[in-house]
């Protein structure tokens, strides 16, 4: 290729779109830092002992158009049959107003988990709607704001039964009509937490002494039956009962809460979220009031702000793993907020009457096919059903199944039966084509409809028909035209801060660019329309994508094999520790159960270790934030016989590259342990070092951090795990289509949240080796630039040997609080007035702020943030000097709202301009918090987790 063609080519052009600072700005930043070149900065920051000896072997970066063309070719390898498989996954219509204004909208998908409620009221309201929807449809008192998938929700519910119940038993019951993928995940969780599982017909529940039971309603084979007496009998033996249920079925069926269920779980996928070959989708959990403080996952509650106005927040956070660590009830962090929002908006848009129409149509089509099949001489397994039929096909099973495939139809095959599940996308012409497979040609569906319509709900027992009202809150009965819905979505979006407004400098969260080109393929039907349990040859595109992505990730990490199954970082940690424990078992070392964890670790680490019955032993950190090598040696010697592993994060959670990391790995290996390297900070490794090169045995990667899957306001996430070859046999399997066997599943689908994998593939493909390495270097450049600008004004807690930091820095507010009285929370809230999301507060050290700018923020935005922080420091000086009283200044009163600006009274010693327009940039483009500082204590003491009455909104 000629030099001119190279100059005019589009390869690698995405790199400058992704990385914020222009190359012409690097020198100014380096001058501020005190380095002559970017390479010098890297050499002073990353220890030479761990730097890769040669570049990664990855292709050069593709242009956006070239990447999309290649990915489209991969997508077109998938075959889109009409799916009647069911088993918890259904085709659905995503309302276009939700598709365009939520799923495809960076105002929704680039926001962070709503830990800062003052700038998150929109998605908090959407998630509260989700909770209300689940509570109404299940008939239970409280619900959480989503879990990862139905199978993991069932596993969480099992542990909740043990925690919240009074039974002394260690046995858990699973009905034999539960989805097989759910049973598989339950078995994995039970094995490693120490429970026994019995699978039996639900009628035999009373013959077992169990602490909890999981039933399915309707069952996986479609049967609808009243569970009231069964549940009541279980309660006499102190057994808590979980029922996995279907939200659309619950529109017509008696809700499980009215049957006495203690816990309801399930998936909200069919409420407008594509199947996506398994995910992501929002699972739900609802419980009785008595179990609320033990329930896993995030819960949205109603509180008030400092002015007494209604404000929403995440409630009961002291339950969560980042607080309780090894004593946490769950390791859940990221769930499925974006998908929960989509499901809640689906319910808002359709309303109760719209949902009834959809449910009636699905049931009616099921009844039509049932009538036609029975008339033709086929026998049904069950006479009572909602949307699923199981047809006894005996010797014809394989013939009919193959005939269906020839007609581009997927049925669910049992040994001598075929399952057929219907959904809202089913049409009359679909029924005609389907019935032809069973030898019923030119079926008269209109005639059949008239016959079935004489008793529309004959297939639902009278005592199983819903009589109670649901979704009565005005929010579900108002926004039914597209204009109304569009404006409601926009109103909520406008309340929230996202990357569309400015930098989100959250340490340990890597809030980088989620490029549009990376996001586009998520909505392609070739990726969205495939059932996760379709025959593998129909998912050739997904197989190609997964193989390619795993190969890329192996090259980036230095591992030998990957599993893409874990659908969150916490799930990846769990899968990784299971792999370690299975490895030890295979070598006759099942007694190895001690997990060493540095005191600086994220709370998920000890919470996950506890989930696999490990004994957590904390290793001290020294005054520089590094692992205390003397304490480590003592702990290894003390626990050598039982040492399973160590969990470390690299660079450390303190934001530095620890010089002795290889020595740490060697010491643990010498004692027979394995090294788990948490991939949360992989954004500071790519292209410069790697977990495998450092000496780690297994890591999870947060694809929603380093590899550009958006945070979605609290999910979706992806946490695939990479392993060295000796751990590869112990990666999770799956009961359906599993490439690693059938056992030890950690998610409902083998590829986890498969439909968002194209995002990470696209990012790597467009960046290439050069771009990925450059991104890491720029992330380090940006972080050190911010540190050097702030260091004259704020103490920086930890730095490396040469005074450098990795990709994030910790600012110590504790000494400033002693002299000024201003806390890290005051600074965080004041940043909102300047147009910024707060850094990470009080993690990993209480009383600090951790800042991670990522490589995507340009110099102007970095300066805007630094200027804001310096201005805040000057405001703190005014408090310290007595110019402003400690109880009445712009920091303790932050954030300020438009209502504050327009208030008739102003009883503050600072002006409205200082309050609301503290910088010139805020006058140019102002983001407004919609509530004042939220009262967390009030919210937990007066716990309300349902939609407030309409009067509250009117106020």
Swiss-Prot record:
Single GO MF descriptor: glycine dehydrogenase (decarboxylating) activity
Keyword match RNA-binding: no
GO CC term, one of those recorded: glycine cleavage complex
PTM annotation (N6-(pyridoxal phosphate)lysine): residues: 705
SUPFAM superfamilies linked to this entry: PLP-dependent transferases (SSF53383)
Subunit structure: The glycine cleavage system is composed of four proteins: P, T, L and H.
Protein name: Glycine dehydrogenase (decarboxylating)
Organism: Aliivibrio fischeri (strain ATCC 700601 / ES114)
Gene encoding the protein: gcvP
